[in-house]
Each structure stands twice: as C-alpha cells, then as structure tokens.
Amino acid sequence: MIQSSIRDLNPGKIVCLARTFAKHAAELGNEVPTDPIFFLKAPSALIGPGDAIILPEQSALVQHEGEIAVRLSASLTRASEAQAYNAIGGWSVLNDVTARDLQRADAGRFTRAKNFDSFCPLHPEFIDIADWRQVAVRTVVNGVQRQYGALSTMVFTPGRLLAYVSHFMTLEAGDIVSLGTPHGVDKLSDGDLVGIELVNLEGHCLRRLENPVRVA
C-alpha cells in the first residue's frame, strides 16, 4: 500500500483515459474507440479528500466522472501488458471533474474543460488489489448512487490501457493513470456532496473519496 497526502504525491503526469466504458461513450453520443483515447490532466487541479470542488463562473454544466486510478511504481516505455501490470504500485479513486459545456464548445477536446483548479479530486492512499476483475467504481451524490461500473466491463483491460499509453509517452514512477468513467455522469451543483468509491463486487467499500461542491 502506498500512503501519502496529496501534497506528497507530486505526480509528474496525470493521464486519463476516455470512453473505456461503452455505455458512457454512448451517453455522450460517441462511438466506442478501437484504440484507447487518453489526455493529460494538470497536477495543479489536484485536491484531496474533504477539499471543495469549485464550480467556475465560466461553466454552467460541471459534471462528476468517478474513476479508478493507479499509481505507477516503475517506469514504462513501449511496455507489454504484463510489464504494465507489474508497474502498478496501487489503486485508488479519482473524480475527473469536467465542464461539459466547455468540452462541447471545444469540439470534444479535453484541455479547457478538465483542468480548472480543484477538477481532479484524488484519494492519496493507494491500496493493493489482488484481482482487478473483482472491483468496481461507484459515484454517490448526496447519498444517491449515480454511477457504477465494474472494471471487468471496460472496453480495454487496465494492462492494455497502460501499455498503449507507454507506446506514445514514457510513464514514470509516481505518475497517476485514471482508467475512465462508467455511464451516469451528471451535473454537480453548489452544496452537493460527491463520493467516489472503490468497491469489491460484493459492495464492500475499499476506498472512499468525498468532496463538497461550492461555487467560485
């Protein structure tokens, strides 16, 4: 298990994967990709448990995207899937907060919509997972479940995602890679309390990230 505070993590990169769950791709009107799609999220967007997600004045539609993230314990360059799994140092949860109206205005591009300060809540304590096929991500807002997705239902395996990215850029020890969100993304409003949970398939919570939502 990797234990740290958000201040101590200091990742060189935060890499996020898109459209890794087919139903999420469909709810946004997108096709399921034949190869993984990834983008970078700025480390300056990181916040920890209990920190507020700030709704910026530039957006009228900010949405949650609950995801499972991994932290690398070794570097990967042009890696195989087996090498990718061996480089995973731990598993946690991340909220890929997105200004959806800005993303649509930017023809689907990610940078402006996903990199406001506070748009990357992350639980800084990473745990060991014996079998990734036995875990899921769940998003709960004000006590109501909005998202649920088992990793076994993803379009690509975690190893495939990491290996693919490593053929375009070197992934280094300490980097964070977030594996994508299931369907059910929805609007966040001032006063909401959003929780992202890493759960096993029996529903037991292994890790929970909780953040209040506030206007700027």
Predicted regions and their residues:
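Extended, compositionally biased flexible segments
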Residues: 1-74, 195, 209-212
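Glycine-rich, pocket-lining loop/helix-strand segments that form or immediately flank
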Residues: 37-42, 46, 93-115
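RNA pseudouridine synthases
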Residues: 65-95
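Short, glycine- and charge-enriched coil/turn segments that flank and shape catalytic ligand pockets
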Residues: 59, 79-85, 129-132
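Short clusters of hydrophobic/aromatic residues that line enzyme substrate/ligand-binding pockets
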Residues: 46, 53-55, 62, 79, ...
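Catalytic-pocket segment enriched in acidic/His residues
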Residues: 2-8, 24, 30-32, 100-216
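Short, acidic Gly/Pro/Ser/Thr-rich loop/turn segments
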Residues: 22-24, 46-47, 76-79, 98-100, ...
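A residue-level signal for conserved active-site and pocket-lining positions in enzyme catalytic cores
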Residues: 18, 70, 96, 122, ...
